UniProtKB/Swiss-Prot annotation:
Chain segments carrying region Transactivation domain (TAM): 233-308
Pfam family, one: HMG_box
Stretch list, region Transactivation domain (TAC): 353-470
GO cellular component, one term: nucleus
Domain remark text: The transactivation domains TAM and TAC (for transactivation domain in the middle and at the C-terminus, respectively) are required to contact transcriptional coactivators and basal transcriptional machinery components and thereby induce gene transactivation. The 9aaTAD motif is a transactivation domain present in a large number of yeast and animal transcription factors.
Biased composition (Low complexity): 338-349
Taxonomic source organism: Gallus gallus
Biased composition (Basic and acidic residues): 1-12, 163-178, 219-228, 242-257
Motif (9aaTAD): 424-432
Stated role: Transcription factor that may play a role in central nervous system, limb and facial development. May be involved in male sex determination. Binds the consensus motif 5'-[AT][AT]CAA[AT]G-3'.
InterPro entries: HMG_box_dom (IPR009071), HMG_box_dom_sf (IPR036910), Sox_N (IPR022151), SOX_TF (IPR050917)
Tissue: Widely expressed in the embryo.
Gene: SOX8
UniProt protein name: Transcription factor SOX-8
Dimerization (DIM): region residues: 67-107
Length: 470
C-alpha cells in the first residue's frame, strides 16, 4: 500500500493546490525547467501537475500512470512532486461514490458470462481492432447471427470456458444471488390507449370527434377532408359504453361503407345530393334507446333551455348521428336553429310550394353528413341512424321514409323540432356561423315522414334546405 501511495504521489498533485486542477500538460512542460518554487513545499502553487485528473480517479489507473509519469518528466520534477505529496494522508481524500464502485456498501457482482457472451466478447475485441469503423450495435447483431449458425463443435470451447467461469464465480461468491433490476411497469395509459386505438380502427378508421360543448361525435371522414381547416373541434379519444351494445349494427353498417370507400378517398360535400341515399339501407335501420344517451348530455345547460319556442317544444332537437348509433361515439348533437329555420307551422303555410330555407351548419350536420355519406356518389353506405338527415336541419324530419324504420324510441320530434327562436349567436364555435360561403344541397327528395310518430304529420311536401358551409 505504501508503494501505491508513492505512485499516486507521482501521478497526482495535492488536491489542495489550485494549480493542480487547472494546469494543463503544456503548462507543465513549459515550467519543467524552471527552478523549484519555495511555495511548493507548502503545497500551494506546485506547478508541475502531471495531469488534470480529479483526485478520486487516481487509484483506477495508478500503475500505468506512474510508469508514464516517470518517462515524461525530468527527475527534479518527480522528486519535487513526491516531496510535496509525501506528508499528505490520502485516506482523508473524499472519493466520489460513483467513481469507485468498490467503496459502495455492497459492490455489484456481475453474473458469470454464458457461452455466447464469452464468444461475443472475444470476437468483438478482434473485430473492433480489425474494423474500427464498425458500429457496436451492428457488430452485436452480426455476432448473434453468427453464433446461431455455429455448430455444436464450434461452440464447445466457448461453452467450456463459460462453465469454467461459472464454477470460478461460485467459488468467489458462494452466496451470490442474481437480483435483476426491477423493470418499471408498463404505463397504465399505454395499454388503454392501445385498446382504444383498436376500438376506433375496427370501425373503419373512425375518429370520434367529441365537441366539448356540443357533445357531437363526427366521423373520421369529416376529419379527413377538413383536415386542412384549423377550426376543427377538439378530439379527445372516447370509448363510450354503447359500443358494446351496437357491435352487430356496426358490422352491418361498415359492410356498406367499405364498398363505397373502395372508390375514391375524399368527398366534396358541396356536390353531395342526399336524396341519392339507397332505400335498402334506410330499411335496415334498427331502433335504439334514446335514454341511453342521456349520460352524454352537454354540461353547459342546453338541457335547461325553455321549451316554448316551437310546436314540438317538449322535445330536444337531439339528432343522433349514426356514429352515435353504430360507432358508439354516442353524441347528442344539440342543434339550435336560427329563426329562419322552419318550425312546423311555417312549413304548413308554405305547403303548396317547396320551401328553401337557409340553415346554419351545425356540428351534427357534420357528423351525419360526413358519417352518412362517407364516400361518394352512391350512398349505400349510409346506415343506422343517419337516414338522410343532415341532422342539423329543422326539416330533416322529411328524410325518414315511411318504410320499416321503427322510431318508437326516437320520440319523433327529436328530429323535427329545433328551437326556432334561437338566434345564430347560440353557436359556441364561430366556425358554425353562416358567414362562410354557402353551398346548396337539395337534401330530401322523395322521402316522407312516418305518420305514426310525427307531430307534424301533415308535412307530405318534401322540403329543400339550403345549408351554409362553415
Amino acid at each position: 500500500m505504501l508503494n501505491m501511495t508513492e505512485e499516486h504521489d507521482k501521478a497526482l498533485e495535492a488536491p489542495c493546490s489550485p494549480a493542480g486542477t487547472t494546469s494543463s500538460m503544456s503548462h507543465v512542460d513549459s515550467d519543467s525547467d524552471s527552478p523549484l518554487s519555495p511555495a511548493g513545499s507548502e503545497g500551494l502553487g506546485c506547478a508541475p501537475a502531471p495531469a488534470p485528473r480529479p483526485p478520486g480517479a487516481a487509484p483506477l489507473g495508478a500503475k500505468v500512470d506512474a510508469a508514464e509519469v516517470d518517462e515524461r518528466f525530468p527527475a527534479c520534477i518527480r522528486d519535487a512532486v513526491s516531496q510535496v505529496l509525501k506528508g499528505y494522508d490520502w485516506s482523508l481524500v473524499p472519493m466520489p461514490v460513483r467513481g469507485n464502485g468498490s467503496l459502495k456498501a455492497k459492490p455489484h457482482v456481475k453474473r458469470p458470462m454464458n457461452a455466447f457472451m464469452v464468444w461475443a466478447q472475444a470476437a468483438r475485441r478482434k473485430l473492433a481492432d480489425q474494423y474500427p469503423h464498425l458500429h457496436n450495435a451492428e457488430l452485436s447483431k452480426t455476432l448473434g447471427k453468427l453464433w446461431r449458425l455455429l455448430s455444436e463443435n464450434e461452440k464447445r470451447p466457448f461453452v467450456e470456458e463459460a462453465e469454467r467461469l461459472r464454477v470460478q464465480h461460485k467459488k468467489d461468491h458462494p452466496d451470490y444471488k442474481y437480483q435483476p433490476r426491477r423493470r418499471k411497469s408498463v404505463k397504465a395509459g399505454q395499454s388503454d390507449s392501445d385498446s382504444g386505438a383498436e376500438l376506433s380502427h375496427h370501425a373503419g378508421t373512425q375518429i370520434y370527434k367529441a365537441d366539448s360543448g356540443l357533445g357531437g361525435m363526427a366521423d373520421g371522414h369529416h376529419h379527413g377532408e377538413h383536415a386542412g381547416q384549423p377550426h376543427g373541434p377538439p378530439t379527445p379519444p372516447t370509448t363510450p359504453k354503447t359500443d358494446l351494445h351496437h357491435g352487430s349494427k356496426q358490422e352491418l353498417k361498415h359492410e356498406g361503407r367499405r364498398l363505397v370507400e373502395s372508390g375514391r378517398q375524399n368527398i366534396d360535400f358541396s356536390n353531395v345530393d342526399i336524396s341519392e341515399l339507397s332505400s335498402e339501407v334506410i330499411n335496415n335501420m334498427e331502433t335504439f334507446d334514446v335514454h341511453e344517451f342521456d349520460q352524454y348530455l352537454p354540461l353547459n345547460g342546453h338541457t335547461a333551455m325553455p321549451a316554448d319556442h316551437g310546436p314540438g317544444a317538449g322535445f330536444y332537437s337531439t339528432s343522433y348521428s349514426h356514429s352515435a348509433a353504430g360507432a358508439g361515439g354516442a353524441g347528442q348533437v344539440w342543434t339550435h336553429k336560427s329563426p329562419a329555420s322552419a318550425s312546423p307551422s311555417s312549413a304548413d303555410s308554405g305547403q303548396q310550394r317547396p320551401h328553401i330555407k337557409t340553415e346554419q351548419l351545425s356540428p351534427s350536420h357534420y357528423s351525419d353528413q360526413s358519417h352518412g355519406s362517407p364516400a361518394h356518389s352512391d350512398y349505400g353506405s349510409y346506415s343506422t341512424q343517419a337516414c338522410a338527415t343532415t341532422a342539423s336541419t329543422a326539416t330533416a324530419a322529411a328524410s325518414f321514409s315511411s318504410s320499416q324504420c321503427d322510431y318508437t324510441d326516437l320520440q319523433s320530434s327529436n328530429y323535427y323540432n329545433p328551437y326556432p327562436g334561437y338566434p345564430s349567436s347560440i353557436y359556441q364555435y364561430p366556425y358554425f356561423h353562416s358567414s362562410r360561403r354557402p353551398y346548396a344541397t337539395p337534401i330530401l327528395n322523395g322521402l316522407s315522414i312516418p305518420p305514426a310518430h310525427s307531430p307534424t304529420a301533415n308535412w307530405d311536401q318534401p322540403v329543400y334546405t339550403t345549408l351554409t358551409r362553415p
